[in-house]
């Protein structure tokens, strides 16, 4: 079963990845990266319909939140994404 996982990285990035290849954060499992300047998720280079839909949903979901690095971690824990 495929699922999404939100990784909050030490360099103030949040990365959404999938487990579709049974690997955790790596180039080819990365779906999108959170841009703290734009305050939105952007697609990684391996764009697909799945990741476009995911990015739209995530940006809509996070629209009402304070999306600082720490709050992204809290949202992830509360929503069981992390």
Feature locations, PLM:
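Terminal leader/tail segments of proteins
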Residues: 1-82
């Amino acid at each position: 079963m495929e699922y999404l996982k939100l990784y909050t990285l030490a360099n103030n990035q949040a990365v959404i990845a999938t487990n579709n290849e049974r690997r955790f954060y790596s180039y080819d499992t990365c779906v999108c990266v959170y841009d703290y300047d734009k305050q939105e998720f952007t697609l990684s280079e391996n764009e697909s319909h799945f990741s476009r839909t995911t990015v739209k949903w995530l940006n809509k979901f996070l629209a009402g939140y304070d999306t600082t690095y720490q709050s992204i971690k809290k949202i992830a824990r509360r929503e069981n994404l992390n």
